[in-house]
Structures are given as C-alpha cells and as structure tokens.
Amino acid sequence: MAIKRAAFNPAVRAETDLHDCALRLARVQDGHQRFGLFVRLSALQAGLRREHHLRLAAAVFDPILRRFEAQLFGLSNGDLMLITKDVPVLELDNLTAKLRGMFADDPMVYSTGQDGIGFATMFDIRRSPSDFLGLCETILADALARHQTIPSPAKKTSGRTDDSSRLTAQSLASICEGL
C-alpha cells in the first residue's frame, strides 16, 4: 500500500513519524534485533480509554526508554507503538504483562481482533520488515481517514450584508430596554 502525503496534517504527526521510521527500518540490515510492540488501547472499553489511563499505559514504557535504545509513538487514537533496538524479549514480555494487568477488566486484553492483532502484538522487524511496514501504513491510512476534513461548500454572497445582522441605534436601544 503506497501512502501519498498531500499536505502536512498535524493531527496525524505521530502516525507520519511512525511510518517514516518504519520505512527507514525496512531498509536497515545492520544485524541488530529490532522489535515493534503495538498496544491497541483504542479497542478497550470507553471507561478504560480515559486520558489518565492512556498516560499510565505510556508510563509503563519509561524504564525501557531510559535503559535501552527505544522510541514510543503515542498515536492520535490512543494506541501506542514502541520500537526497540536490542531489547531482550523478556523485557517486552514483562511490559506486556504489566499492561494486561492494568486493563485486565476488559475482555479485549486477552483476545485477538479480526485483523489478527490483539491488545499487545509484537513484531520482529528484522525478520519481517514488510509486515511491520504494512501495519504502519494501515495505521497512517486509518488516521488520515479519521482526521480528513471535508471542506464545506463556499457561501455565495452577493456582496451585500444581511440587514438583520447589523447593529443599529434601534436594535441597540431595544437591547438596552431588555436589560
């Protein structure tokens, strides 16, 4: 799937940055182990998608971000994508377990969506960069569709202003009387 960027859309900045990163990683063959951990917070029940829940979920990644070479993308729909370099799989499994524990009240945490992606899905970028790039393209396309603005039809004006919207001495007097 090819994504064309017509114009910069700040509403999908994280998705655009993620897609750019995935494009670069698809070309890199340096022998480093790279993983992508996609956390689908947008599929949780509405009560668990509040702003403070999203902040707490992002904070779970802080130890990884401090100790390893990693980058966290907070997407516009609330989902998170962590891209890591040379992080042990056990560390990522521990993160996933913490996140599942935080949102254990939601049945989606332990199920898989129709697209085969569950609550937390790990991608081995080094072994299958095309799968990861495909996911990132889908994420970007969905975000662009979600934030697409439909221009309203232009108003036809004859150059005259509507008399009812003018402030006149009479309308001002009637306003003052009403007070």
Question: Model-predicted segments: where are they?
Answer:
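Regulatory and interdomain segments flanking nucleotide-handling catalytic cores
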Residues: M1-L179
